[in-house]
Amino acid sequence: LARLLQPDTRPALEFELPWPWGGERFALNDIRPINHIVGPLGSGKTRLALRIAERFPGAVFLPLDRAEGDATATRLREDAGLRARVDAALAWLVEDGATGSEALVALLAGLEAEGPAAIVVDMVEQGLDHATQEALIAHLRRRGAGARPLFLLTRSSAFLDLAAVGALESILLCPANHSPPTYVAPFEGAPGYEAVATCLATPEVRARTQGVIAWRPTVSDPAG
């Protein structure tokens, strides 16, 4: 319980926060095998993720459009070892209820790559259905304490089930008011917990609202 509540105090990675912050000095003091990055739209999640990928030695960034084009297919054709690892992971995930898709294969190609010291993923749930997200997070948790760090942006309650967060995971909240990111413990009543919870929604809700822009009807002219 104490391990979940209290982050490590050892400075692991320090950098200046990018816009929309004001260049404040920030330290990632609690880097674990799985690091969730959460925040509302416009809170700076992706810019923070890019800064982490820039400043973490040997890290790579998997963008939102990772499944587009033929880059993944080309990599898998040219790297038999990567292909074997992706096939093995895909088989495990499908057996656990996941749906095979180009989005999942592209994500696995990034996650199973040899070489990167850390992997930063923009919206890890992109293109994945509910069951696939649940299978994926279970798969990632099985990597154990010695696994290389993953920084995973998410707004999905299927992928980030707050009741299931374990000791090998951290939650980093990007607040709506652009105050510096803060670590949040996965317990009701913990500082920031409600803010994290309100950022998350099921894949079904996310699918219905994806791309929706708020609209306010025009008030009719009474004289018209």
Which residues fall in each region the model found?
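P-loop (Walker A) phosphate-binding loop of NTP-binding proteins
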Residues: 40
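Conserved lysine of the Walker
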Residues: 45
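C-terminal lobe/lid and adjacent interdomain/linker elements of RecA-like ASCE P-loop ATPase modules
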Residues: 131, 135-224
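Hydrophobic anchor at the beta1->P-loop junction of P-loop NTPases
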Residues: 37
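Conserved nucleotide-sensing/catalytic segment adjacent to the nucleotide-binding pocket
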Residues: 71-118
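Conserved P-loop NTPase "ATPase switch" module shared by AAA+ and STAND
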Residues: 113-131
